[in-house]
Amino acid sequence: MKRGVKRMNRLSVFGCVVGCVIQLAGCSMGVPSRAEAEEDSVNKMNMEEKMYAYKYPHPSVTTDNVIFGFDGNTVKVLLIERGGEPYKGCWAFPGGFLEMDESAEEGARRELMEETGLTTPFVKQFHAFTAPDRDPRERVLTIAYYSVVRLSEVKGMDDARQAKWFALDEIPENLAFDHEEMLRVAREEISKEIRLNTKDWQEMMKGFSKEEEEKIVSELGMRN
């Protein structure tokens, strides 16, 4: 009986030793304990929460679309009436905030479609507007695109009350944000495209006849 007890005691001691060895081996092999695993999980969650909460302030980014439409005789520009603040009720170019998983051009095309239902085969990035006070909500940079398309029916959707084509001499006063400057710069840049007959201009003119192109050039004006 005593021999059996001693044997059992020796086995118990041996089991404890083996367990300790396994535990130590696990530590040396980098296997995390439960507490360490929980700490890693918390740290990961904190990192995800802080992903965009950097120490230094940083601006938001939007895109805007200056779209010129040709109806066969004249060139018009597409505007939307804003349905929310800031500048609620004012006219502006279709645009909005860039999403995390899209390029600037993808964002511009998405906003154009969401707010007006319009799609275009080609848009040209022409300027970034970065004045610190251009948006009363926060620091916002906007990347602007333009295109010339055949005028088609549009409809205000999403956060746009309505979408409408305006003749170049009938554009409403006091456009939202810095969009009056945006229109001026767009016309200056597109005039350069016309004067130099760039590949981008040729791309925009696909689908238009030579006669139509001449009318478009006359409407937009040759600016130095």
For each predicted feature, which ranges?
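Boundary at the C-terminal end of the N-terminal hydrophobic targeting segment
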Residues: 35-37
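N-terminal secretory signal peptides that target proteins for export/translocation
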Residues: 1-10
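Bacterial signal peptide processing site
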Residues: 28-29
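Polybasic "coupling" helices that flank or enter modular domains
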Residues: 194-224
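Short, basic, low-complexity termini and linkers enriched in Ser/Thr/Gly/Pro
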Residues: 12-15, 21, 25, 217-224
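N-terminal strand-loop-strand
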Residues: 46-92, 105, 120
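Unchanged
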Residues: 98-122, 127-194
